[in-house]
Amino acid sequence: ELYVWTEGFQPGTMQRARIQLNALEKAFVLLEREKVRRIGVTLSFGTVERCLDLVTDAFDAHRFHTHRIVVLLRGQLDRLRSPYRVRGCIDWLRSQQIPVGYRLGAPRASMEMRAIDLVQPDFAKLLAPTSKRPEFWEDVLLEARAAGLRAERVIVAGIETPEQRALAVEAGFGFAQGSAIRPAYDPPSIRTPPTLPAHDAPQAATDDTRT
């Protein structure tokens, strides 16, 4: 997953959209240059709603690599003016064989039913519970199942300790993220090194080389 965040300031809606669109473009560059085999990117509901054409154009421009990317949606439905635009984008992505997931912002799936109904995610991600009680972790996963999410396709994020990892395994989560699973790392560089002229290559005459 290509994860992007800001430090020191809170981006506005359009700033966030530009950041996410740039991240989407970088993800495709990483795929094109074979820096990664598969990659996931996050798009907010607001970005999809306001920049729908730019989002679909990005996928159209890299159609030979769309089968290697997954999209994770997030956001608040209450702020959407046109939910049908988001739903239309989801349907379009799936028509391109692109899996679409949803990141839960609330601690329990029961608090996100409207968003889950809208996205109908192929997979979902939620933050690890703060409780150390195994029963609480099991209840969180049971709620996710009751909401229509498949346990083997629920990612629990924020696993920072071996104890949390053990609780996630015991509860039955399919996947997990966090430093206790694999520490975050910088994405591969996509900068192209400058090309140096060959020693035998002829050079254009300058004031210093003219005779």
Residue ranges, per PLM feature:
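Active-site beta->alpha loop and helix N-cap motifs at the rims of alpha/beta catalytic domains
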Residues: 39-56, 60-80, 85, 92-93, ...
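Bacterial c-di-GMP phosphodiesterase EAL domain
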Residues: 1-64
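EAL-family c-di-GMP phosphodiesterase catalytic domain
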Residues: 5, 74-79, 103-211
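A general structural detector for well-ordered alpha-helical segments in enzyme core domains, enriched
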Residues: 27, 54-58, 85-92, 112-115, ...
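Short, well-ordered coil/turn segments that N-cap beta-strands
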Residues: 35-39, 64-69, 96-100, 120-122, ...
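A broad, low-specificity signal for short, low-complexity segments enriched in glycine/proline
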Residues: 30-35, 61-63, 83-89, 136-138
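Intrinsically disordered, low-complexity terminal regulatory regions
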Residues: 33-38, 52-54, 84-85, 203-211
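Short, flexible/disordered intra-domain loops and linkers
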Residues: 11-15, 80-84, 133-135
